[in-house]
Amino acid sequence: MANPIKIGIGGPVGAGKTQLIEKVVKRLSKEMSIGVITNDIYTKEDEKILVNSGVLPESRIIGVETGGCPHTAIREDASMNFAAIDELLERHDDIELIFIESGGDNLAATFSPELVDFSIYIIDVAQGEKIPRKGGQGMIKSDFFIINKTDLAPYVGASLEQMAEDTKVFRGKRPFTFTNLKTDEGLDEVIDWIERDTLLKGLS
C-alpha cells in the first residue's frame, strides 16, 4: 500500500504509550498489515519492548533515537520519522497502518499534520486528577484522548468523574475514554474508534 494511514501516539513518560500500541496491534494485526515506529531520546528501549512482546515481526518495528527534544522529532523536524516510514515501506510494501510513538513529552506536544493522519494522546491517573484541567495542546487537539490506569484512582485520591468533566470542558465533543490497559478495560473503545474513524470500517 503506497500511502498507509499513520496514527501518532503521544503522552508523558510512563503513561502507557508502548503498552497501548502492543495491545492495539495484537488485535488489529490479525486482519491488516501494520508497522510501528518508536521514538526515544538516547535509546531504543520502546522498540525492544515491542519486539520482545512478539506482537509483530522485528522487521515491522523501527526505533528512532531523537537525540534531543522528543517534541521536535514529531513536529518541527520530523525527518527521522519520515525516513523510518520510507524504510518500513521498503521492507513491507503491503503496510496499511503505521503507529508512530513519540518519546515521553509534556502536555503541549503535538504531531505534525504532515507526519500523521490522526493522533491519540494518553495520560495516566497517577499523574493527578488536575491533569485534564491543565489543558495542553496534546490533550486538546488530539483526535482521541485516553486516561489510563483507572485502577490507581483510589490510591492517588483522583475522581474519575471530575477528570471526565474537565476533559469535556477542554475537548468539547472530541472523543475520549478511560482505560486500564493492564486488564484491557476500555481497549474495545479504542479499537472501535480506530476502526470507525481512521479505517472507516462499517461505513458504506
UniProtKB/Swiss-Prot annotation:
Q: Which residues bind GTP?
A: 11-18
Cross-referenced Pfam families: cobW
Q: Which CDD domains match?
A: UreG (cd05540)
UniProt KW keywords: Chaperone, Cytoplasm, GTP-binding, Nickel insertion, Nucleotide-binding
Task: Tell me where in or outside the cell this protein is found.
Answer: Cytoplasm
Q: Which domain of life is it from?
A: Bacteria
Biological processes annotated in GO: urea catabolic process
**One GO MF term attached to the UniProt entry:** GTP binding
Q: Chaperone among the record's keywords?
A: yes
InterPro entries associated with the record: CobW/HypB/UreG_nucleotide-bd, P-loop_NTPase, UreG
**Per the record, what is one GO cellular component?**
cytoplasm
UniProt KW Cytoplasm keyword? yes
- State the similarity comment: Belongs to the SIMIBI class G3E GTPase family. UreG subfamily.
Q: What does this protein do?
A: Facilitates the functional incorporation of the urease nickel metallocenter. This process requires GTP hydrolysis, probably effectuated by UreG.
Quaternary form?
Answer: Homodimer. UreD, UreF and UreG form a complex that acts as a GTP-hydrolysis-dependent molecular chaperone, activating the urease apoprotein by helping to assemble the nickel containing metallocenter of UreC. The UreE protein probably delivers the nickel.
Can you say what this protein is called? Answer: Urease accessory protein UreG
Organism of origin is Staphylococcus aureus (strain MSSA476)
The organism's taxonomy opens as: Bacteria, Bacillati, Bacillota, Bacilli, Bacillales
